[in-house]
Amino acid sequence: MEKTEESVGIRVYTTTTTQNPSPTSSRSPKPVPLSSLPMLPAGAAAGGGKGRKRRMVAKGVQKTVSKTSMLVNFLPTGTLLMFEMVLPTIYRDGDCNGINTLMIHLLLLLCAMSCFFFHFTDSFKASDGKIYYGFVTPRGLAVFMKPPSPGFGGGDVIAEKEIPVTDERYKLRVNDFVHSVMSVLVFMAIAFSDRRVTGCLFPGKEKEMDQVMESFPLMVGIVCSALFLVFPTSRYGVGCMST
């Protein structure tokens, strides 16, 4: 049986694969209710605030030490150590009330006075090998504790005539005043580079104080170095290493 073209037809189908969107991608994510989220305890939030404040204080201390490390050599040894030990007990958690601010003022005054007066002290080594300290005066060295005279206790005693009272090296000079004033300036530069001090003494002025203290310690170091070269000293008083 013959088939004509009208009775026989060929249809060609082209199959195209269409990617059906996944039901999960077409759907928008459901909002999560706030009530289902875990709530942090109040102590955790407060602890995070304290930890952040401690990190800021530690960062300020590191910045202070890095800026003023070159100035430490101009200060008596015990002054800066006392300041760094007493300040954390006053500052505590950053509570700058009236009492804490007053105590910071007193601490700064005490340390500044020690920087000033310690530069008017000197020492000498006696024949018994001990080191004796005293204040330099226009007349000579005024020893804090005079050694006992021979015959009272015996042993390691020196005669009072060994005290260099009339020695020119132990008389008050202009260099002593220059070094005292410069030492106070160096201490103030170090103290005000600490954010714990500026935050309590100048509340709300932290940004301005940071800008000032960016260059103030460097300027103090340059000026003090130049003046200490012009006015050298050979004092080995309280807080200095004796040779």
From Swiss-Prot:
Acetylation found in the keyword field: no
Keywords: Endoplasmic reticulum, Membrane, Transmembrane, Transmembrane helix, Vacuole
Regions that span the bilayer: 70-90, 98-118, 174-194, 212-232
Name assigned to this protein: Protein DMP8
Membrane protein topology class: Multi-pass membrane protein
Superkingdom of source: Eukaryota
GO biological process: endomembrane system organization
Task performed by this protein: Involved in membrane remodeling.
Pfam families (UniProt xref): DUF679
Tissue specificity remark: Restricted to flowers.
Low complexity biased stretches: 14-29
Keyword Transmembrane helix: yes
Entry similarity comment: Belongs to the plant DMP1 protein family.
Gene Ontology CC: endoplasmic reticulum; endoplasmic reticulum membrane; plant-type vacuole membrane
Lineage of producing organism: Eukaryota, Viridiplantae, Streptophyta, Embryophyta, Tracheophyta
Chain intervals for the UniProt region annotation (Disordered): 1-37
Subcellular location(s) per record: Endoplasmic reticulum membrane; Vacuole membrane
